């Protein structure tokens, strides 16, 4: 599937999204932009099934992680216009 996983710089490095992902799409990498000195990364987006558990787990008000579903998924779910 061709989903895109975008990590925003509002990430607080809490690891909740990494732990919520059932397919290990995400991992933490070093980053100086937050107190935790790490940020989520999505090196294996080809394994993403679009469950959005990472989005649900994110504790920030900004949804620091977003999954953008591929066209084939939105069509099959009846979400395409």
UniProtKB/Swiss-Prot annotation:
Q: Does the keyword Plastid apply?
A: no
Keyword set includes Iron? yes
Q: Which domain of life is it from?
A: Bacteria
Q: Which GO terms describe its molecular function?
A: 4 iron, 4 sulfur cluster binding; electron transfer activity; metal ion binding; oxidoreductase activity
Q: Where is the 4Fe-4S ferredoxin-type domain?
A: 1-31, 39-68
Q: Which residues bind [4Fe-4S] cluster 2 per the record?
A: 21, 48, 51, 54
Q: Which SUPFAM superfamilies match?
A: 4Fe-4S ferredoxins
Assembly and binders: The cyanobacterial PSI reaction center is composed of one copy each of PsaA,B,C,D,E,F,I,J,K,L,M and X, and forms trimeric complexes.
Indicate what this protein is called per its UniProt record: Photosystem I iron-sulfur center
